[in-house]
Amino acid sequence: SDVRIIVESLSKINKLELTSDEEEKAIYLRKVMVGLSEDVRVLYIKLACRLHNMRTNWAIKPLNQKKKAMETESVLIPIAHRLGINSIKSELENLCLYYTKPDVYNDILEKLNKSRDELNSNLENMKKELSNLLKENGINFEIKGRVKSVYSIYKKLATGRKWSDIYDILALRIFVEKESDCYLVIGLVHSKFRPVPKRFKDYIANPKGNMYQSLHTSVFGDNGDLYEIQVRTYEMDE
């Protein structure tokens, strides 16, 4: 039965020693884990279990906390990425950073919290401007906005950028009904707001390896802040 296959696959995966500092071994372990999963639901269950474990990671010994975080980072997060489960991937990334580099995590979080009210205000203003623009052009849509995660900002800092040089920490996602509307929305956005050169990415015509589809761009708002904007259909987001 399906249940028996899932239970047996999970049992095999749970016996694996997943911790590895070596990239080659981590890649091998990911392949083994995928190979042991006769049903993709096994990987979803494993990721859900690991997310629960990481959320309660504080309850175990510090040495084991870091070991579990490193294991998650090298083996399980790439699998979440491959499956396109971005919500789990993002939360795991933040939790892993918290347990592997707590000082870095807390420093970024403290800086974010100091400017959070201003960031949220700017985000809401941009949402209103975009909403008015799309309504004026008769487009059915939904907009969601967010301040980027601690891990996302950490990755930018890791490239050598200074905190004062990081402007693109505000992101908006626009959902529309048809693929043609995605391109129409991008055209309207670029006509009203100045786009950042070389930041437009068409993942609809050229999907990512995990079949992720969306249009990405970055624009300057009227206040000079930088906003990352993603446009996709509801179907592409499923």
Show the residue positions of the predicted features.
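Hydrophobic or amphipathic alpha-helical targeting/insertion segments
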Residues: 1-11, 85
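Nucleic-acid processing machinery
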Residues: 15-43, 50-238
